[in-house]
Amino acid sequence: MEKLETAAQSITWHVTSARWQVAREVAAVEYLMATLGSDRFLPPIGGWSVDYSVVAAVLDGALARGGPVHSLELGSGAGTPWFASVAKLTGGQHVAVEHNPVFVARTMALLEHYELLDFCTVVEAELTPGADGAEWYALAPITSRVSDGSVDVLVIDGPPASVGPQARRPALALLERLLADDALVVLDDVVRAEEQQTLAAWEQEYGDRLRVLPILDRAALFRLRSAAPSEGPQSGDEPDPTEEA
């Protein structure tokens, strides 16, 4: 009897959660349609790609920031035209990073179809082993197109989990210098244990500089403040003043 009650409670929780998820997505779609004002049928998203609520939160943050908003997306797909549309609305630019040549071609085809190529660049960056042996995007193709301190919004939806444990954890350490102060960051798929561990590790590493915004459920949304000058440069960033010229 106790097992049946537990099972019933679990089913009730999942049904309630699903109903709230549907309600959130409907509200997000209504906001996007009213605010983006697009007369095109952009590709449906959700499932493997980001949810509508993620794009809505990015759009809301972009409008609150004001001015041209430049965004960087790790992992391209159906969500890319949506982020490119946000960039178009604000007068900014979107850059999508993709390691798979097949998906690069598909994303480019989507952007061409929706006439968004002027507002989005797709960067092909292969996955290469780092010092710890874990694979991550080659940095050179990214940094050659994105300047330091220019990224207002970072969407982390890659590399895929199949790459290895906590595949997305290197993102902040490797890309922090590209971020503008108080940049908006999205970590997708936090329903998975590995992304939860990644977020927890970032919260510990960045402390008060990282402020989570409790708006989304399947993704984490937070702001990352730049390091204060008083915190000093990282080792090796500046020459030793005692060293002779």
Q: Which sequence ranges carry the predicted segments?
A:
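Rossmann-like AdoMet
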Residues: 1-53, 62
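Short, flexible loop segments at the rims of nucleotide/cofactor-binding pockets, characterized by
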Residues: 46-50, 73, 129-135, 160-165
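SAM cofactor-binding core of SAM-dependent methyltransferases
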Residues: 47-128
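Structural motif
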Residues: 72, 153-155, 186
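Short, charged, surface-exposed secondary-structure boundary motifs
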Residues: 105-107, 132-133, 222
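Adenosine-cofactor binding site in Rossmann-like domains, unifying the SAM/SAH pocket
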Residues: 126-144
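A short acidic, Gly/Pro-enriched loop at the edge of an enzyme's catalytic core
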Residues: 145-153
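C-terminal substrate-binding/active-site "lid" region of AdoMet-derived donor-dependent transferases
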Residues: 159-245
